[in-house]
């Protein structure tokens, strides 16, 4: 696949702030760059169940989708994370039905949960990988691009920076918040 980067799951964090947020970290298959994606609690659970190979006594919501598409004759061939904007990642579910390919827009967390169930590959574009990957600061610390952080997390980080009197960081966060609000108008 030209200009695409194949991904695998590297890890998932425990709870972040806000309390129901998790960091799903995807890693390129051939290389070391990592892509952090903030997801909700239910989506994290749907992914974690597959990561630990737990078989629930009854199907979860994400388990129903493969059963349904199989019955309808469609197969998920891959997922593609095609866009990242203001901390939100956008993905396609790429299907094949009787030799015809079609795609459906999806939240990235749902796309990853389904890719695990279908055992199909996950991709992103090289542009997204370049702009959104974690930067290794050494000593087990990483820096996340400000563009990949949600508005809520930016506002909380701004308040924390002000409280700690870290005014240079606060001004960068304030500028990013303003820029995003202007784009929304």
Regions found by a protein language model. Give the residues of each.
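Divalent-cation
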Residues: 2-151, 156, 162-163, 171, ...
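Extended, charge-rich alpha-helical interface modules
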Residues: 182-185
